[in-house]
Amino acid sequence: MALLQISEPGLSAAPHQRRLAAGIDLGTTNSLVATVRSGQAETLPDHQGRYLLPSVVNYHASGLTVGYEARLNAAQDPVNTISSVKRMMGRSLADIQTRYPHLPYQLQASENGLPMIQTAGGLLNPVRVSADILKALAARATEALAGDLDGVVITVPAYFDDAQRQGTKDAARLAGLHVLRLLNEPTAAAIAYGLDSGQEGVIAVYDLGGGTFDISILRLSRGVFEVLATGGDSALGGDDFDHLLADYLREQAGLSDRSDNRLQRELLDAAIAAKIALSDADVAHVEVGGWQGDITRSQFNDLIAPLVKRTLMACRRALKDAGVEAQEVLEVVMVGGSTRVPLVRERVGEFFGRTPLTSIDPDKVVAIGAAIQADILVGNKPDSELLLLDVIPLSLGLETMGGLVEKVIPRNTTIPVARAQEFTTFKDGQTAMSIHVMQGERELVQDCRSLARFALRGIPALPAGGAHIRVTFQVDADGLLSVTAMEKSTGVEASIQVKPSYGLTDGEIANMIKDSMSYAEQDIQARMLAEQKVEAARVLESLESALAADAALLSAAERQVIDAAAEQVRAAAAGEDADAIKEAIKNIDTQTQEFAARRMDQSVRAALKGQSVDEV
């Protein structure tokens, strides 16, 4: 069945013309850039054949250096050598100083409290530093592709908030890049393995990088990834493996001088080399500080086992947050260079009860997924006749009581996307609910565009507000919409794939957005009035039900007062004054409090009738 395409105005793809796009993994420790050539995604190396670019920038009087050269300056020029800047993105200075108290940089606050780093190149913010890393990656891609990039997809952690995501976009703009989309890192890894086509279910992405560990639980449905839960440890990564092994080697070699920075660097380099060797061999030979000896994989495993256990504890918490069991996970994707360690792969496999996916280089997998997505978004996908969109041009939502529109997915949300919201019944014994899908920016149904209607039947007959209906909106990478409604206690479900409809023109979309701004104040007032009328109807219906059941609890005088208050609500609700309705509701609430208390006492006595104190 064809679906409704929700198009972004002003965009058009030219399938016959190949456009240059790249995927960028802007990492905490290292960054990469990848592209699709001849139908295959590949990471792009520098002139020395190195794919990784250390996420390090050194600023000096005559300019700056990025990557390996910058990292070499870290020991002798720590103040001007900025690394792990991703940790600072979108955070206030106070937050950074609390989280990372031992940073060697000279930090000060900007006027709005954001961090500024004092360097030989001047006062710089994290966005500018990130932009310099992105420029280096873009230059690599431009040279390899012999042309300027038409667009990039940049990956970000799934837990990045709006400020951190906006900071990443700002950095790209400073670097002169057109961002097609920010893509969640776990989603990019899943795309690299082709998990976005043909499968549905739960996927875990285990990402153990140099300085951080992230676990993401995703649900894939009809090509849309929904992030169910994220977790991890921002202070745990492969670097910790290296330091543990370096300390072990120091002890074995009898090297007690910890003030010798050169020796510390030598120990760390030896530890890294041994760790890499032990991924393929059972024994690694080490020479450091005039000492030489062997370390076995078993010894290394004993050292790092507690750290690996910590990652699995985070996995367990994430699964609990997602509400799924380990055995429900269809695939486990491994990301990050530290997942090459055999013990990590073994323990993760045991935890999830399946062999993790490791066929793609874990350092490259996120960049490769981003490149695949960039190639699609820029219009190079050969088998796609549909425009692939960056954002939803107009908000999507549902009609609620009173002719109001409840927005579920706001305009300008990047796609693909899945969002869910819970609704409840309005009347006692309600067993069906009409779902009316809307598109637009206004507050009232009459001012928005109707997309579809369907009904959810089989809702349990409960008091008003007793049933909980979860409505999920999904927009896939082609901008196509489907809506599902499910009653949570029974699992009864209904859905709709929105049928083809005449699309809106660019002018119509622009007018809808313009109207939402022009009529904003009027719309808010209309919404407040409608909400108060809905609340008045709910209060009167509840009161009518209570009086029908328990009017005997009231004296004639009390009943008269309540009836008068109810009439006041009816009269106010018939008018157009939201404040008057609100006051009438407040008054009837006051007048019925004693009645509500008596009904509660009666219910408690009935529930306890015939029971002893011990039974209670």
Curated annotation (Swiss-Prot):
Key words of the record: ATP-binding, Chaperone, Nucleotide-binding
Which molecular function GO terms apply here? ATP binding; ATP hydrolysis activity; ATP-dependent protein folding chaperone; unfolded protein binding
One GO BP on record is: iron-sulfur cluster assembly
- Which SUPFAM superfamilies does the annotation name? Actin-like ATPase domain (SSF53067), Heat shock protein 70kD (HSP70), C-terminal subdomain (SSF100934), Heat shock protein 70kD (HSP70), peptide-binding domain (SSF100920)
Q: What HAMAP family does the annotation carry?
A: HscA (MF_00679)
The record's function comment reads:
Chaperone involved in the maturation of iron-sulfur cluster-containing proteins. Has a low intrinsic ATPase activity which is markedly stimulated by HscB. Involved in the maturation of IscU.
Family, similarity comment: Belongs to the heat shock protein 70 family.
Which PANTHER family did the record assign? Answer: HEAT SHOCK PROTEIN 70KDA
Recorded protein name is Chaperone protein HscA
Whose protein is this, by species?
Answer: Klebsiella pneumoniae (strain 342)
